[in-house]
């Protein structure tokens, strides 16, 4: 069993390993047909598995160990990225990356949450859980972008805001609440993209936007499936049941009017074709940025207010 892949991906991985083993043979004259048949079989199996994923399986894909993180996208989506540091109050939180960049030659302010892949990186980025100084840094950069009329682009990928004692002492809840308040009236366009995991207030604190997009196999929820299962069922192993109830996938959120656009993923998920995922993200951002720039600021703010006020409305 390949530990870099999820359990439901294992049949696909086994076929790919067979294809790779055949590809390593120097004289391929006698195995060309066999390789071709295996590739067709692998592609068909991938389509079959990914056409009927459960909400829990999508939740697992959103946290896939090989899924791209914020820093994986920056150099491919943006040009001339210059990182800015610190909240000018306490310190610099590495879990939130921010700075000035260009998207299709247009100056933008970029802010994104970063997790980390190795043990050292996970500690550096605090497993993608921002502290108050991270959210205050984000707000400082947002205010700067408003001053210079630069659109804001945020990448959301966090299990949630850091719940440590120090973070609470430094005003975690206040920092999140202030971001929500300020972002609702920032006089500049805001585009947010959930690239992986959107966890509760930790995600919302950089997610109040004019356009909210999600990758197809990302999630956005008030609580993790495991946390929900622990509360509702007193059993974290029932996370699959909780995931179904939370309606946390991009399809459910789009249907309920909580997000605007779903960005498609390569067959098998982002980790199967990272290069294609970067292209899809960049194209979606450029398209939305070009459209949203056409709106007068007054209209933009009015639309944003209406969007926020419509959250939670439902029909019997």
Swiss-Prot record:
Residues 24-291 form the CoA carboxyltransferase C-terminal domain. Gene3D superfamilies: 2-enoyl-CoA Hydratase, Chain A, domain 1 (3.90.226.10). GO terms for cellular component: acetyl-CoA carboxylase complex. It catalyses: N(6)-carboxybiotinyl-L-lysyl-[protein] + acetyl-CoA = N(6)-biotinyl-L-lysyl-[protein] + malonyl-CoA. Keywords: ATP-binding, Cytoplasm, Fatty acid biosynthesis, Fatty acid metabolism, Lipid biosynthesis, Lipid metabolism, Nucleotide-binding, Transferase. GO terms for molecular function: acetyl-CoA carboxylase activity; ATP binding; carboxyl- or carbamoyltransferase activity. Pfam families: ACCA. Its main location: cytoplasm. InterPro entries: Acetyl_CoA_COase_a_su (IPR001095), ClpP/crotonase-like_dom_sf (IPR029045), COA_CT_C (IPR011763). It is found in: Cytoplasm. Its EC number is 2.1.3.15. One of its GO terms (biological process) is fatty acid biosynthetic process. Pathway: Lipid metabolism; malonyl-CoA biosynthesis; malonyl-CoA from acetyl-CoA: step 1/1. Acetyl-CoA carboxylase is a heterohexamer composed of biotin carboxyl carrier protein (AccB), biotin carboxylase (AccC) and two subunits each of ACCase subunit alpha (AccA) and ACCase subunit beta (AccD). HAMAP family: AcetylCoA_CT_alpha. Component of the acetyl coenzyme A carboxylase (ACC) complex. First, biotin carboxylase catalyzes the carboxylation of biotin on its carrier protein (BCCP) and then the CO(2) group is transferred by the carboxyltransferase to acetyl-CoA to form malonyl-CoA. Belongs to the AccA family. This is Acetyl-coenzyme A carboxylase carboxyl transferase subunit alpha. The gene is accA.
């Amino acid at each position: 069993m390949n530990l870099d892949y999820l359990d439901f991906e294992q049949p696909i991985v086994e076929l790919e390993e067979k294809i790779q083993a055949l590809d390593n043979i120097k004289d391929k004259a006698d195995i060309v047909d066999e390789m071709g048949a295996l590739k067709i079989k692998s592609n068909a199996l991938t389509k079959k598995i990914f056409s009927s994923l459960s909400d829990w399986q999508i939740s697992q894909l959103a946290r896939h160990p090989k899924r791209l993180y914020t820093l994986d996208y920056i150099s491919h989506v943006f040009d001339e990225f210059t990182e800015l540091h610190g909240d000018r109050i306490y310190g610099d939180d590495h879990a939130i990356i921010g700075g000035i960049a260009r998207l299709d030659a247009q100056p933008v302010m970029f802010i994104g949450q970063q997790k980390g892949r190795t043990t050292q990186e996970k500690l550096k980025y605090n497993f993608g859980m921002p502290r108050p100084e991270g959210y205050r840094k984000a707000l400082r950069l947002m205010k700067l972008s408003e001053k210079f009329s630069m659109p804001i682009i945020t990448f959301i990928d966090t299990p949630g805001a850091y719940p440590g004692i120090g973070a609470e002492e430094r005003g975690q809840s206040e920092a999140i609440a202030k971001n929500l308040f300020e972002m609702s009236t920032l006089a500049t366009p805001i585009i947010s993209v959930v690239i992986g995991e959107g966890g509760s207030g930790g995600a919302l604190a950089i997610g109040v936007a004019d356009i909210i997009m999600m990758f197809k196999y990302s999630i956005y929820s008030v609580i993790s499936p495991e946390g929900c299962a622990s509360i509702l069922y007193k059993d974290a192993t029932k996370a699959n049941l909780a995931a179904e109830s939370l309606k946390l996938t991009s399809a459910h959120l789009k249907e309920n009017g909580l997000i605007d656009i779903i960005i498609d993923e390569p067959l098998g998920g982002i980790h199967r074709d990272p290069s294609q995922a970067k292209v899809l993200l960049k194209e979606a951002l450029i398209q939305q940025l070009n459209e949203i720039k056409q709106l007068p600021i007054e209209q933009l703010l009015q639309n944003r207010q209406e969007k926020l006020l419509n959250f939670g409305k439902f029909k019997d």
